[in-house]
Swiss-Prot record:
One GO term of the biological process aspect: circadian rhythm
Known role: Accessory subunit of the mitochondrial membrane respiratory chain NADH dehydrogenase (Complex I), that is believed not to be involved in catalysis. Complex I functions in the transfer of electrons from NADH to the respiratory chain. The immediate electron acceptor for the enzyme is believed to be ubiquinone.
Lineage start: Eukaryota, Metazoa, Chordata, Craniata, Vertebrata
Sites bearing N6-acetyllysine, chain numbering: K189
Transit peptide: 1-35
Gene encoding the protein: NDUFA9
Keyword 4Fe-4S applies: no
Protein name per Swiss-Prot or TrEMBL: NADH dehydrogenase [ubiquinone] 1 alpha subcomplex subunit 9, mitochondrial
Pfam families noted in UniProt: Epimerase
The organism of origin for this protein: Bos taurus
Length: 380
């Protein structure tokens, strides 16, 4: 026999007529909220999970300086747009530098203003770090340092970008023997005319873990010696640390007085190129065998590397740049004006050069090496 089915009885509590309006009022009218100043409202958990209020587009973010700039921006809670032309796998190292969804990647074409516009239309800050060590069939120095920066500055101006940061070079000069430095000088002029409120930064040679300065000289040992024009005793360098340059860029973004100014970023000490390279080999615990090489012979070697199908170790233009004395520009503000204390080369060179040591000297202390000889700031 089938079991009897007993329907469930749902009981509803009686509600008085006077309670109905009160219930409706509680549903449709939320209680008053406290008015708090934005300064006392927490913005994230701090670090990269905070909110800096900066939305920055960084052109050239996959390069040497770019990865440091993106890291600093992401670490302070900024949203960073990274336009790139490379394979997506070549940008993987940038993804962990910001919180989830804060590092945004997009393809772009330096010759297409529409793609530039898509990259900057939502940004309050645009940073141009586009650069190239040597010319290629697709992009020469005029394209990289003049036309593309001018296009980025123009589109940024039209899009209403608040701050534009352009990276040039300390030795940029229209009369330079280096096409690289001549193009940098023209690019500065074009950016200033297109975006008068832009902040232009002129760093000296930058050294860091992935640089093409200290590593360049350390790798010369594979050629059996160190070729230098006039033994490097007629060239003066004042290299600056990569982290100091990055801090200067970030502080220039925060400083409202930096708009429309040009800054010169240099290290605290000046060195003869001979003494600097000698110090590089001393830190690497490698034999230093310098020899003078005529200017025309060094350029001929550079030309051989240029026509090679592989990445050139040096070029004729790089020969000119490394033998160009760094300028002294006392009329321009520097790192100290942005609250950054320049780091001495002797404190950070080991980070770059330790990998050039043999196993025997791998853990040797930096104190075992005599500091490089310096010259006065008013030197040659």
């Amino acid at each position: 026999m089938a079991a009897a089915v007993h329907p469930r009885v749902v009981r509803v509590l009686p509600m008085s007529r006077s309670s109905v309006p009160a219930l409706a009022a509680s549903v449709f009218h939320s209680p008053p909220q406290r008015q708090l100043h934005h300064a006392v409202i927490p913005h994230g958990k701090g670090g990269r999970s905070s909110v800096s209020g900066i939305v920055a587009t960084v052109f050239g973010a996959t390069g040497f300086l770019g990865r440091y700039v993106v890291n600093h921006l992401g670490r302070m809670g900024s949203q960073v747009i990274v336009p790139h032309r490379c394979e997506p796998y070549d940008t993987m190292h940038l993804r962990p530098m910001g919180d989830l969804g804060q590092i945004i990647f997009m393809d772009w074409n330096g010759r297409d203003k529409d793609s530039i516009r898509r990259a900057v239309e939502h940004s309050s800050v645009v940073i141009n770090l586009v650069g190239r060590e040597w010319e290629t069939q697709n992009f020469d120095f005029e394209d990289v340092f003049v036309k593309i920066p001018q296009a980025i500055a123009q589109v940024s101006k039209e899009a209403g970008v608040e701050k534009f940061i352009h990276i040039s070079h300390l030795n940029a000069d229209i009369k330079s023997s280096s096409k690289y430095l001549r193009s940098k000088a023209v690019g500065e002029k074009e950016v200033r005319e297109t975006f008068p409120e832009a902040t232009i930064i002129k760093p000296a040679e930058i050294f860091g873990r992935e640089d093409r300065f200290l590593n360049y000289f350390a790798n010369i040992r594979w050629f059996g010696g160190v070729p230098l024009i006039s033994l490097g005793k007629k060239t003066v360098k004042q290299p600056v640390y990569i982290v100091d340059v990055t801090k200067g860029i970030i502080n220039a973004i925060k400083d409202p007085d930096a708009r429309g100014k040009t800054f010169a970023f240099v290290g605290p000490s000046r060195y003869l190129l001979f003494d600097l390279v000698q110090y590089v080999f001393a830190v690497a615990h490698r034999p230093f065998l310098p020899y003078p090489l005529p200017h025309f012979a060094y350029r001929w070697i550079g030309r051989l590397f240029e026509i090679s199908p592989f990445e050139p170790w040096t070029t004729r233009d790089k020969v000119e740049r490394i033998h160009t004395t760094d300028k002294i520009l006392p009329h321009l503000p520097g790192l100290e004006d942005l609250g950054v204390e320049a780091t001495p080369l002797e404190l950070k060179a080991i980070e770059v050069l330790r990998r050039h040591r043999t196993y025997r000297w791998l853990s040797s202390e930096i104190e075992d090496v005599q500091p490089a000889k310096t010259i006065p700031t008013s030197g040659p």
